[in-house]
Amino acid sequence: MKVTIVGAGNVGATCADVISYRGIASEVVLLDIKEGFAEGKALDITQCATNTGFNTKVSGVTNDYSKTAGSDVVVITSGIPRKPGMTREELIGINAGIVKTVAENVLKYSPNTIIVVVSNPMDTMTYLALKATGLPKNRIIGMGGALDSSRFRTYLSLALDKPANDISAMVIGGHGDTTMIPLTRLASYNGIPVSQFLSEDVLQKVAADTMVGGATLTGLLGTSAWYAPGASVAYLVDSILNDQKKMIACSVFVEGEYGQNDICIGVPCIIGKNGVEEIVNINLNDQEKALFAKSADAVRGMNDALKSILV
């Protein structure tokens, strides 16, 4: 199985590293516009093989999309990173043209591929990729919810002092500081609601920390995070290539689900060999429904900035 990652920056390279190390794909191609950059990252990752024991073929290319031919999954990380103080909305004008061009180029050589969008603002870039390519909605997936849910589980783990892998929790809604919705009511530790262990005040603090998780790291690092985002992409790609049918929160195109239409937004999905196999309907309470509707309105508002690009 072959995976192409467009954009060999921190997130793209980390994704390639995790996919290779875990043997998720037999071949990974890193592509970047900067001369020699993807080649260098690929060579560095390849030189880990003897110490970490993987056999994945990793190669890098400079803007040569012919080398990506036959990719089962294409991951788009291209775009400028989020800078301190920069909103996701401000990224739209810069990144939209990049994502559109990349999506069109990869489809020339991999017409049957599934595209995973990582570029920010992620929900809007996912919507752009869908509309610009005309692909079936199951083949365009935004990664955001997988990362947000991972951060939510991590903060719950810290609050509980229990292993994160024993915690089930999900974030839906837009992939933004004010639009994501950590579902504290449904979070559990080994099947037991976390509300039995944590007070409402602590749960609200966990939710708040989750919502600003990306911004917190941007402030600390001076740029966007990359380890957790890269690992989250690899987790999603694994479920696609190996038809694992995991339920993962992803930004996908909705047509009536959760009362919304004509946007890409984070909802629980079954992810398998066909991409989005199913959108899972969770019975939200009235407060959660209101938050989701508000989140959808915010995402829809950002999409308005795409009108001049999609004409």
UniProtKB/Swiss-Prot annotation:
Listed transmembrane segments: none
UniProt organism field: Flavobacterium johnsoniae (strain ATCC 17061 / DSM 2064 / JCM 8514 / BCRC 14874 / CCUG 350202 / NBRC 14942 / NCIMB 11054 / UW101)
E.C. numbers: 1.1.1.37
Catalytic-site annotation from UniProt: H175
UniProt binding sites for NAD(+): G7, A8, G9, N10, V11, G12, D32, N95, V118, S119, N120
HAMAP family, A to Z: Malate_dehydrog_3 (MF_00487)
Gene name in the database record: mdh
Family statement drawn from the similarity comment of this UniProt entry: Belongs to the LDH/MDH superfamily. MDH type 3 family.
Name of the protein in its database record: Malate dehydrogenase
GO molecular function: L-lactate dehydrogenase activity; L-malate dehydrogenase (NAD+) activity
Residues bound to substrate: R82, R88, N120, R151
Xref: Pfam families: Ldh_1_C, Ldh_1_N
Role played: Catalyzes the reversible oxidation of malate to oxaloacetate.
